[in-house]
Swiss-Prot record:
Protein name: Outer dynein arm-docking complex subunit 4
Record-linked InterPro entries: ODAD4 (IPR040111), TPR-like_helical_dom_sf (IPR011990), TPR_rpt (IPR019734)
Subunit and interaction comment: Component of the outer dynein arm-docking complex along with ODAD1, ODAD2 and ODAD3. Interacts with ODAD1; this interaction may facilitate the recruitment and/or attachment of outer dynein arm docking complex proteins, including ODAD1, ODAD3 and ODAD2, to ciliary axonemes. Interacts with components of the IFT complex A, including IFT140, TTC21B/IFT139 and WDR19/IFT144, and the IFT complex B, including IFT46, IFT52 and IFT57. Interacts with CFAP53.
Known tissue expression: Expressed in trachea multiciliated cells.
Chief place of localization: cytoplasm
The gene coding this protein: ODAD4
A GO-annotated cellular component: 9+2 motile cilium
Basic residues: compositionally biased ranges: 167-179
Source organism, top-level taxon: Eukaryota
UniProt organism field: Bos taurus
GO biological process, one term: heart development
């Protein structure tokens, strides 16, 4: 078998580099480092290969080897950016944040890439985090320090020569100890607020009268001061060696402890924390992680509620903002009831502390929740309350559009058109083409519901032009479809209007014919009435006149007959009695006829009286008729009356004379019969 090393060395340098990069991406860092080593055997000192192998060592945790390869890549070219970046990354991983920051800055000056910028921020943050939060213990030049006496006495027995003596009698050792720190700047960054305490303790050492003083059990003030200084130095060394992740965990634990609640935070730290938290919450929500945004917001809200107003002057405004963030995350998660409660809390805080911007924000979000769940009228009421609080024209554009959209959903097309036109006007003032597009579509849709198809087509055409300007293909297609529907609506409306006009004309003709017929019949009736009235009046008048004359004649005749009867009886001769008997016997048959004639005469008389009563009218009717008749008619009536009066009177005279004669005959026959009955002998 052949030697594997010789077999490996038979490959080319690019093949080893490609193999190492592939293995590195697969996570096989040891094999990748071996491939890069083989490549360096073929081409030693290659900068890119050294940087690649340094990355593998860094992933494997061999930090020293990684640093050696990174420094080796810079030997030939100190400005090699990849080598500088790799060295900075290695130093950062080793915990040497200061030197890492130096190399990040050096690389950023040579080539301002994103990697160097991120490295600078990362190293600076690591330095700040490694310093940690201020400790709860702070030494002051007051109070009783006897609580340290027992601990100091036990430590004195175990300690080596006195530290003050070392400080006084061994200045070289002191300088060496101080020289262990890289610089006072590093110590200041590591200790943070405690660096002031360290300086204070060092100043106390210069006061010889103070350090000679003793406390209980023989413990001197000098011993206590040196104990504090030694503690701070050991702490700074420890924090410097920690990696950023451990420093963050330590800060997180310290923030949860009670001493942080009683201690004032720096305003700058509080502001940075709040701003950073709000940015993280917003970033998580916009990136699609609504659950993470909700958890982050609830966590920050819990912390802010623990602070007092001295630490956070605008605490109320911040709490309302966090409730708003929580509500927005709940909307994205579909938790509408919880979202409504969160936004209402935001609104309550805004009203309580008179925060107009927060009130506008809360009303906006509450309206969105109502619109999402389909309660459009409540959304309209909420957004209409927000209108006076809207500051910018663009905000009004959006607000009017949403209100109009809700009215359109409620089938209130007039209101939807009105708000759509307001939105369109504001969008034109702002010069926002997309909102002009949205407003035009809203107005057109409202006009379609109002069946104003011509105006709808005009607005759809405007919207189509704006959609082309903003290159919105989906909107263009939707508007084209809506235009087709609107044009079809116009055609249908024209058909309906034509049909309605035809029906209207037909009804008008029918009504006209009916009116003509009615007017004609009415006129004919009127003419008939006018013609018949004078004839009726004449007949009535003639009948009344004849009846009066008949009454007068009958009354005279009856009086004359009654007066003649006794005279005739006296004049009659007794001789004629027999003749009367014979005549009565002979004329018994004709007497019956006379009786029938007399009965008929009585009937005619009765009929005449009835007709007289029927045709008898009050004088007022005669007066009205006489008043209404014209002079010409009165003249005609007089002529007719004169003519008819003569003829009718003659006829009446004849009939009356005949009737009177018949009545006389019947009366005479009755009288004769009575006399005969009286003359007959009584058996």
């Amino acid at each position: 078998m052949a030697d594997p090393e010789n077999e490996v060395l038979r490959s080319t340098f690019p093949s080893y580099m490609a193999e190492g990069e592939r293995l590195y991406l697969c996570g096989e860092f040891a094999k990748a480092a071996h491939s890069f080593s083989n490549a360096l055997h073929l081409q030693s000192g290659d900068k890119n290969c050294l940087v690649a192998r340094s990355k593998c060592f860094l992933k494997m945790g061999e930090l020293e080897k990684s640093l050696e390869d990174a420094e080796a890549s810079l030997q030939g070219d100190p400005t090699f950016c990849k080598g500088i970046l790799q060295k900075a990354e290695t130093l950062y991983t080793m915990g040497d944040f200061e030197f890492a920051l130096v190399f990040y800055h050096r690389g950023y000056k040579l080539r301002p890439d994103r990697e160097f910028k991120v490295g600078i921020q990362k190293a600076q943050e690591a330095i700040n985090n490694s310093v940690g939060s201020p400790s709860s213990i702070k030494l002051e030049n007051k109070g009783d320090l006897s609580f340290l006496s027992k601990q100091a006495e036990s430590m004195r027995a175990q300690q080596k020569p006195h530290p003050v003596r070392q400080l006084i009698h061994h200045p070289k050792r002191e300088s060496k100890r101080k020289g262990s720190l890289k610089s006072e700047k590093i110590v200041r960054q590591l200790l943070g607020e405690l660096y002031v305490d360290k300086e204070y303790l060092e100043k106390l050492l210069l006061d010889e009268d103070l350090i000679k003083g003793t406390i209980k059990h023989g413990l001197t003030v000098e011993d206590l001061i040196m104990t504090g200084i030694n503690y701070l130095e050991t702490r700074s060394d420890f924090w410097r060696q920690q990696k950023p992740i451990y420093a963050r965990e330590r800060d997180r634990k310290l923030m949860q402890e009670k001493w942080l609640r009683d201690r004032k935070r720096r305003p700058s730290q509080t502001a940075r924390y709040i701003l950073k938290s709000l940015e993280d919450i917003d970033m998580l929500l916009t990136s699609g992680s609504a659950e993470g945004s909700l958890q982050k917001a609830e966590k920050v809200l819990k912390k802010v509620l623990e602070w007092n107003k001295e630490e956070v002057p605008n605490k109320d405004e911040l709490v309302g903002n966090l409730y708003s963030c929580i509500g927005n995350a709940q909307i994205e998660l579909g938790q509408m009831v919880a979202a409504l409660q969160s936004h209402r809390k935001d609104l309550e805080i805004a009203k309580e502390y008179d925060l107009p911007d927060a009130k506008s924000r809360a009303l906006d979000n509450i309206g969105r929740v109502f619109a999402r769940v389909g309660k459009f009228q409540q959304a309209i009421d909420t957004w209409e309350e927000k209108i006076p609080l809207a500051k910018t024209t663009l905000e009004k554009t959006w607000l009017f559009h949403e209100i109009g959209r809700c009215y359109l959903e409620l089938d209130q097309a007039w209101e939807a058109q009105s708000y759509g036109e307001k939105s369109q006007q504001c969008a034109e003032e702002e010069g926002d083409m997309e909102w002009q597009l949205n407003a035009s579509v809203l107005v057109a849709q409202a006009q379609v519901k109002l069946r104003d198809f011509e105006s709808a087509v005009n607005n759809f055409e405007k919207a189509l032009e704006r959609a082309k300007l903003v290159h919105n293909n989906e909107a263009q297609q939707a508007i084209i479809n809506a235009l087709d529907d609107a044009n079809k609506g116009i055609i249908e409306e024209l058909k309906k209007t034509n049909y309605r006009e035809i029906l209207k004309e037909k009804k008008e003709k029918e009504n006209a014919t009916m009116l003509d017929g009615q007017t004609r019949t009415a006129k004919e009736k009127e003419t008939r009435k006018t013609k018949d009235e004078p004839e009726k009046v004449m007949k009535q008048w003639v009948q009344e006149q004849t009846e009066k004359q008949l009454e007068g004649v009958l009354s005279k005749e009856t009086l004359g007959v009654t007066a003649r009867q006794p005279e005739q009886r006296q004049r009659e001769d007794p001789e004629k009695a027999s003749w009367r008997k014979e005549l009565g016997a002979k004329e018994r048959g004709p007497g019956d006829t006379a009786k029938g004639q007399f009965g008929e005469a009585g009937r005619t008389e009765q009929n005449r009286e009835e007709t007289r009563e029927i045709y008898r009218r009050p004088s007022e009717l005669d007066q009205n008729l006489s008043d209404e008749s014209s002079p010409r008619e009165s003249e005609g009536l007089e002529k007719r009356l004169s003519k008819t009066d003569g003829g009718e009177l003659e006829a009446l005279g004849k009939t009356e004379s005949g009737e009177i004669k018949e009545m006389e005959i019947t009366e005479n026959s009755e009288k004769i019969e009575k006399d005969e009955k009286e003359d007959e002998p009584i058996e």
